[in-house]
Swiss-Prot record:
Pfam families according to UniProt: SlyX
Domain of life: Bacteria
Organism field: Shewanella sediminis (strain HAW-EB3)
Matches recorded under HAMAP family: SlyX
Protein family per UniProt: Belongs to the SlyX family.
Protein name: Protein SlyX homolog
PANTHER family in the record: PROTEIN SLYX (PTHR36508:SF1)
Signal peptide location: none
Length: 70
């Protein structure tokens, strides 16, 4: 019976450790999800700002005349 009790205790300890690990991982997932949501919001703001910027008056590089040679 001693061996059975030890095996049960070992399983209980492993289960407790796994529960703690799962809780830690769950908290990390929550933090990463919050971070991702914040980054998505920042990206949406940046896209909106970029879309509202007027195009530059500079010509495209392909439209530019070649520089004078020295």
């Amino acid at each position: 019976m001693d061996q059975l009790e030890r095996r049960i205790e070992d399983l209980e300890m492993k289960l407790a450790f796994q529960e703690g690990t799962i809780e830690e991982l769950d908290q990390q997932v929550i933090k990463l999800n919050d971070l991702m949501a914040a980054q998505q919001q920042q990206l949406r703001i940046l896209i909106t700002k970029l879309q509202s910027v007027e195009p530059s008056n500079m010509a495209n590089q392909s439209e530019e005349s070649p520089p004078p040679h020295y």
